[in-house]
């Protein structure tokens, strides 16, 4: 990922998910997120409900909601993540499932 903005009020990242890749199924105690797809098609799981989002579509992820994004397509998926809350630290991640065995 690439950090575009890192302030006291929000953090903005550009995240690329390679074909066949996915992020952890996770949630956060101290922040909410908004994801906006800018390239590709995202398969997004929110509390066990799966939906597909393409270019320009956004999804709001409230604090505490379990979430994951997957790229089931043949082209890279790129989305913008805007974080709001009291902490944007990478330690505020509770991973339920992770392909890389991170805690």
Model-inferred region functions:
Residues 29-48:
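Glycine- and acidic-residue-biased ligand/ion/polar-headgroup-sensing regions
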Residues 4-5, 18, 38-41, 68-70:
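A structural signal for the main folded, soluble domain(s) of proteins
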Residues 12-16, 34, 50, 58-60:
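Conserved hydrophobic/aromatic beta-strand scaffold that supports enzyme active sites
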Residues 68-103:
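Double-stranded beta-helix
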Residues 1-32:
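A short glycine-rich, His/Asp/Glu-containing loop-to-beta-strand
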Residues 46-67:
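Short acidic-glycine-tyrosine-enriched beta hairpin
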Residues 23, 49-51, 92:
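Short beta-strand segments
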Residues 21, 30-31, 49, 65-66, ...:
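A generic "binding-loop/recognition-motif" signal
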């Amino acid at each position: 990922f690439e950090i575009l903005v890192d302030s006291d009020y929000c953090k903005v990242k550009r995240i690329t998910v390679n074909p066949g890749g996915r992020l952890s199924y996770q949630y956060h105690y101290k922040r909410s997120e908004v994801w906006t797809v800018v390239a590709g098609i995202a398969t997004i799981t929110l509390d066990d409900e799966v939906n597909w989002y393409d270019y320009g579509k956004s999804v709001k992820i409230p604090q505490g909601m379990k979430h994951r994004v997957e790229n089931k397509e043949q082209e890279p998926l790129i989305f913008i993540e805007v974080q709001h809350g009291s902490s944007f630290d990478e330690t505020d991640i509770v991973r339920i499932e992770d392909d890389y065995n991170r805690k």
